[in-house]
Amino acid sequence: MKKSKLKGWLYLLPAIVFLGIFMVYPLVDVFVYAFQEGFNFASQTYKGVGWYNFSYVLRDPYFLQAVKNTFIIVIITVPVSTGLALLISLGLNSIKPLKNLFQTVYFLPYVTNTLAVGLVFMILFKKTAYTDGLVNLIINWFGSESIDFIDGPYWAKMFVMCFYTVWVVMPFKILILTSALASVNEDYYRAAKIDGTSKGRIFRRITLPMISPMIFYLVITGFIGAFKAYSDEVAIFGTDLNVAGMNTIVGYVYDMLYGDSGGYPSFASAAALILFVIVLTITVINLMVSRKNVHY
């Protein structure tokens, strides 16, 4: 081996060791646990190898509810947050003098502690013995009855959850899209204006294709992030998400390991592998679509 290649591998060695210990080994461990039936955590023994853990998880009503919640969050929050971020970024790009100021303001929710933001949302939406919450006060002004967004109907809790998720993830998307818009060559716009091209056509034919790599990057990472949702739900609804009916797949995995029904690493591993397959499948589909629609 040449000295240059050896030197390169030596530079990579710490990262390879780190990834091997904290990523590759846990993944292998999860795969092994998922197929060990009747695993006893205390004695580290199991009764056999098979598909029972997957069968149990896929028939567990708590897991099915978690899958439903996760998919609703993914389907709603990813396109809504990306679309709103694009609109705000276009607006920021058109007001040059105050662009940096507004960009900083919009980015604040992203750097704010998740639990702190969740507490604020609880104050806004939660009904208590002393107040119905700020949002319900606004609803009452319009003559409608108060809604218990935190402990009330499922649709109300899901609305708060999606609203919260969009609020938290949108600042990062605004920052990325604003940077992407700033990198578009102004010569394209000048040439289009000389030809008398309308603003709508400029957006469809120039702006959108030029920033399409960043849009698909945000969509793919948005899907992955939304499927891993858990801490946001805890911030608003507390740790017992099954009672609230707002658990997610990651929350189900955590409960199987450490919750009241915990101590079942085999079930947790099976659920984690199912989540991995779902995320991998959707990511591959997104990448295949991006090859046909992204302009590099």
What is the predicted role of each segment?
Residues 2-296:
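A structural signal for multi-pass alpha-helical bundles of membrane permease subunits
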